[in-house]
From Swiss-Prot:
<feature type="glycosylation site" description="N-linked (GlcNAc...) asparagine">
    <location>
        <position position="181"/>
    </location>
</feature>
<feature type="active site" description="Charge relay system">
    <location>
        <position position="159"/>
    </location>
</feature>
<feature type="domain" description="Inhibitor I9">
    <location>
        <begin position="35"/>
        <end position="116"/>
    </location>
</feature>
<dbReference type="GO" id="GO:0005576">
    <property type="term" value="C:extracellular region"/>
</dbReference>
<keyword id="KW-0378">Hydrolase</keyword>
<protein>
    <recommendedName>
        <fullName>Subtilisin-like protease 11</fullName>
        <ecNumber>3.4.21.-</ecNumber>
    </recommendedName>
</protein>
<keyword id="KW-0720">Serine protease</keyword>
<feature type="active site" description="Charge relay system">
    <location>
        <position position="346"/>
    </location>
</feature>
<keyword id="KW-0865">Zymogen</keyword>
<dbReference type="InterPro" id="IPR034193">
    <property type="entry name" value="PCSK9_ProteinaseK-like"/>
</dbReference>
<feature type="glycosylation site" description="N-linked (GlcNAc...) asparagine">
    <location>
        <position position="388"/>
    </location>
</feature>
<feature type="glycosylation site" description="N-linked (GlcNAc...) asparagine">
    <location>
        <position position="252"/>
    </location>
</feature>
<feature type="glycosylation site" description="N-linked (GlcNAc...) asparagine">
    <location>
        <position position="337"/>
    </location>
</feature>
<keyword id="KW-0964">Secreted</keyword>
<dbReference type="InterPro" id="IPR015500">
    <property type="entry name" value="Peptidase_S8_subtilisin-rel"/>
</dbReference>
<feature type="signal peptide">
    <location>
        <begin position="1"/>
        <end position="19"/>
    </location>
</feature>
<keyword id="KW-0732">Signal</keyword>
Amino acid sequence: MGLFKVIFTAVAALSAVDAAELLSSAKSKDIIPNSYLVVMKDSVSSAELDSHVSWVTGLHREGIAKRGAENLGGFKHSYKINGWHAYSGSFDSETLASILDNDKVDFVEHDRHVYISGFVTQKDAPSWGLGRVSHRMNGTRDYVYDESAGSGITFYGVDTGIDIHHPDFGGRAVWGINVVNGTKDNDRHGHGTHTAATAAGTKYGLAKKANVVAVKALNDYGAGLWSNIMKALEWCVNDAREKKILGKAVLNLSISGGKVVAANQAITNAAKAGIFVSVAAGNDNQDATNKSPASAENVCCAAATTIRDDKAKFSNYGSVVKLYAPGQGITSATPNNQTGVMSGTSMAAPHIGGVGATLMASKGIAPSAVCAELIKMASGPVLNPGANTTNKLLYNGSGK
């Protein structure tokens, strides 16, 4: 196969792709056999990507005709995000070898599973996160916030779907897209509705006047593929561009999985396009440096605290964490006009997304500057934050 331009998925951090690393080195239970994410070099144009995909499609067909190769599906989807180009597909080893040897290809990774970063604990318990992020000191339930409340900002919830008819959204939620084959345009899991309402619900949310867009990229069990997450990201950027709301958009990823460089690059380019991206650190009580999306650049990564301002026992930590936010025992909306309590860094991330949306609406801050401003405003200290981790706690600057 010549020199392989491939990411070794166990590597903690890569500043450049090592062309000698072997695809076969990647080992993980989350890997999808024969399914790949192919990232093009920075110099490749949109037209060149299209031409390359046509070439790959031809190779795949030739393999079936000449070698009797198994039809694994071939090309699936191309990604064009803010000048970044990639595609996904399922290929046999001979076709993959030709892709790896192509001079327009930067690197190839396995497609992998990714999962939500939250879990249900109980129903109908009292909430505390709203009061906590609007006061420097612990112990109050009152939520104090700027009256703009995210007005004019659009929140993209890339998740299990959203019950857009839930009364907590007050008619501000719309369905965007469903990229998960074999599922309906709804939220049968509940995670997506809960996170969206945490960010932008009328009763349970922080940015109470923000618009909400449902983007279903995880199945009804809370699992998904990075190739679908990337497809959803591309759609969000294009939708925001068409609606002329780049610079006034927030995107939340309450998910976690092993580090995938292609996915990180897609997320980073969505942020660079003009979207504030809040992400979950993950729930493994380990350093999030080797996790995606936590390790992506230009995102605001959230770890989770308890009501006592301790690091939640499950929460990941590490240098990629930008802020802690409430994440244990968080009450929010769930499908079919219900409410529920969930815990996880999944709940912490939309707190950051919601406060970020409010900040963008009230101060006109650019998405690229929001995370730094939130860090500057933060309270704390968080107790026992973990090694090499900030002890700063999300605060909305209410003055209380």
